[in-house]
Regions:
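An acidic-aromatic substrate-binding cleft motif
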Residues: 252-331, 335
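C-terminal beta-strand-rich structural cap/linker in extracellular carbohydrate-active enzymes
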Residues: 632-657
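N-terminal accessory beta-strand-rich subdomains and adjacent acidic, glycine-rich linkers
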Residues: 14-282
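Conserved, mostly hydrophobic/aromatic
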Residues: 332, 408, 435, 529, ...
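Carbohydrate-binding surface patches
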Residues: 571-610, 651-652
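Aromatic- and carboxylate-enriched substrate-binding clefts and catalytic-loop regions
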Residues: 343-519
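Glycan-recognition and catalytic regions of carbohydrate-active enzymes
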Residues: 539-586, 590, 622-626
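Bacterial Sec-dependent N-terminal signal peptides
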Residues: 1-14
Length: 657
């Protein structure tokens, strides 16, 4: 294949350079007939000269024949408090260059030790419309990438692809072989030379569409794609709970005047494990708008939908009714689980009205019962129903005692839908409600701006195994791929915790009796590996009671952390992650379908005597995935620990003094 280099489209006269604090990363910006940037890491090309611009409806192109008026440089060095994150403080260290242009706009460039970012800023206070944004990532040569194509998007129109749930597995493909008419959501990871990786992401997406990417035909280049602004919508979709776009405008965003635009991010890792522990999306996001966050309580959730309200040995008909939810509340109270969720079914179907409750549910009684047990209730809500009566819903249910909403089926990221996420977050915060966004685009820092947005889906999570076609879904490989890519963007509501575990050959998708792929210990380890401040226990209380030892371990794992250390990992193969809360460490490891032994370096523990409670795959876990052993050992003085994992296996550790 003949590849065309986009660098030929960059005609520059003036050049500006910006280096990272450690000087390993170098950003070069060229200004001439257009504006181009390039990126080097340790002297090696990562992104070749790539044009960037914004085209406005009045015909102006921000970036064409641009003239620099002023250049400003500064070093940013600060610690960001992050009380509901994977570490309690985030270091924000970078060098910044601000180019101010004639015509009323600026471009901010930042060089971090771990990557670079840029954003456009409009300085004129006059309404305008953005027709398109040119965001280019010119790789310069053939590269392999891990690409989350929009599910079902192949051969479809762009419009049909813009309506999607942002849930798919990763395709490992050459960038030049990506169909130019097929889009992928971000983050996307590209393989570089010498084991390095490039991760393309975005942050601070506020009142603007999210960025997809596609391959520029005949090039080794990825280009941004943005959903146009909806012109007309109709109510429909899943149970009449969605707003479907029937026609779009010729522009992607309406803007009121002065504003900043999203950060375009290029993360560079020397080792895969660095992607497991990257903070760029978080630290580039707008700081918190909430002064008081003491009411936001992360934790675990007993969840009924995945296990299909699967109770046995009870004297009532299990389903969407008060008796069933009282059983879940009792289970949560017994095990110190903070919340129980009422998923889809508590409100009258097809009405998109959260004030019409089915007669089998008495919410006031349930809230009182849960409160007496020190358990909070979270309600599922379809997007249209939630947005239509937003303040009335938030006010009423907050006063009733509900702690939050799981809002679902947005399935878009055009500008009005992004606006909804911010509007919902602000209104929920006003009434001290947490939000868990499902059927939503990936996080772009909203959890920093509104910390009450406690989690996001945008993941091919365990729910997919209720319906997956046999042999067509490899969830085990996905589990050791997703954290290097999707989790770079932020927390993930994967909904782990299955107690019915299967081998690859024995897996069956059964809606009312679902199972996981891989071993029991894999499910335990995922509570450590996956960042999830509001973390589901997906299986039935009946199964958890039968597996009391595993349940006790799971319910003791924190959901937010003071420190995170990526110990080891290779994308698509294995992961080892350590996280600390207070003076207790947890370690989780995952493997693909290959049995393997990892040597864990626990030198981060420092001096002193430590014990490790270890849940590891049993000797027969390759045939019986639920087989495991629990041991307690003294951590070796050399701080080296060997971990054996079965095929599709995992290991979970609690390390304490």
């Amino acid at each position: 294949m003949c590849l065309v280099s986009l660098s030929g489209f960059c005609t520059t006269q003036k050049k500006y350079q910006l280096k990272s604090p450690d000087e390993k990363l170098e950003v070069n910006v060229g200004i001439g007939k257009n504006i181009c940037y390039s990126l080097l890491h340790e002297g090696n090309p990562v992104i070749m000269p790539s044009p960037i611009s914004m085209t406005l409806a009045d015909g102006r192109v921000l970036g064409k024949d641009a003239k620099v008026k002023r250049i400003q440089r500064q070093k940013i060095e600060e610690l960001i408090d992050a009380p509901l994150y994977k570490r309690s403080q985030v270091q924000n260290l970078c060098n910044e260059m601000i180019l101010t242009f004639k015509g009323g706009f600026q471009i901010y460039f930042r060089a971090y030790n771990e990557g670079m970012a840029y954003r456009f800023v409009m300085t004129k206070d006059k309404p305008f419309e953005v027709v398109n944004e040119e965001a280019t990532f010119n790789l310069g040569q053939e590269r392999m990438g891990y690409v989350p194509f929009v599910r079902g998007g192949k051969g479809k129109s762009m419009e049909k692809q813009f309506f999607n749930s942002f849930e798919n597995i990763y395709t490992h493909t050459q960038v030049s072989e990506m169909p130019s008419n097929q889009i992928a959501f971000t983050p996307v990871v590209v393989e570089l030379d010498n084991g390095k990786k490039l991760c393309i992401a975005e942050s601070d997406v506020n009142s603007y569409p999210g960025m997809f990417v596609h391959a520029a035909e005949g090039t080794a280049s990825l280009k941004g794609v943005f959903a146009p602004y909806p012109k007309t919508l109709k109510q429909g979709g899943h149970n009449n709970l969605q707003m479907l776009v029937t026609e779009r405008e010729s522009y992607i965003a309406k803007c009121g005047g002065k504003r900043s635009f999203p950060w375009r991010i290029a993360i560079v890792s020397s080792e895969d494990k660095e992607l497991l522990d990257n903070d760029m999306v978080y630290k580039l996001a707008e700081p918190s708008r909430l002064e008081d966050i003491s009411w936001i309580k992360p934790g675990k959730v007993a969840w009924e939908w995945w296990n299909h309200w699967g109770l046995s040995g009870v004297d009532f008909k299990a389903g969407v009714n008060n008796a069933t939810y009282k059983f879940y509340i009792d289970f949560a109270a017994k095990h110190g689980i903070e919340y129980v969720i009422l998923d889809e079914g508590w409100a009258v179907n097809l009405k998109a009205d959260l004030f019409q409750i089915i007669p089998e549910i008495d919410l006031e009684e349930l809230v009182g019962y849960a409160d007496s047990k020190n358990v909070g209730l979270i309600l599922w809500a379809g997007y249209r129903a939630f947005d239509r009566d937003l303040e009335a819903v938030c006010k009423y249910y907050s006063e009733l005692g509900i702690k939050g909403f799981k809002v679902d089926f947005m399935d878009r990221d055009d500008q009005p839908m992004v606006d909804f996420h911010y509007r919902a977050a602000a209104m929920a915060a006003k009434y001290h409600l947490m939000l868990d966004f499902h059927g939503s685009y990936k996080p772009t820092g909203l959890n920093r701006t509104f910390p009450n947005v406690i989690n996001f889906e945008a993941v091919h999570g365990l729910e997919q195994l209720k319906f997956a076609s046999n042999g067509k879904v490899d969830q085990v490989t996905y589990d050791v791929t997703m954290p290097f890519i999707r989790m770079v963007a932020g927390p993930v509501d994967y909904t782990q915790g299955a107690m019915l575990n299967s081998t690859r050959k024995d897996f069956r998708p059964i809606n009312e009796a679902p199972m996981s792929m891989g071993t029991r210990c894999r499910q335990l380890a995922e509570y450590v590996v996956f960042e999830s401040p509001l973390s589901m226990l997906c299986d039935s209380p009946v199964h958890y009671e039968r597996e009391a030892e595993c349940t006790f371990f799971i319910t003791g794992i924190p959901t937010t952390w003071d420190e995170t250390v990526a110990l080891d990992g290779k994308i698509g193969e294995y992961i080892a992650m350590a996280r600390r809360k207070g003076d207790v460490w947890y370690v989780g490891t995952l493997s693909d379908w290959k049995a393997r032994t990892l040597t864990l370096d626990l030198s981060f523990l420092g001096e002193g005597a430590w014990k490790a409670e270890i849940y590891k795959d049993g000797v027969n876990a390759d045939r019986i995935p639920a087989d495991y052993t629990r041991t307690v050992i003294d951590v070796p003085q050399d701080r080296k620990l060997f971990v054996n994992m079965a095929e599709g296996g995992g290991c979970a550790l609690k390390i304490y003094r």
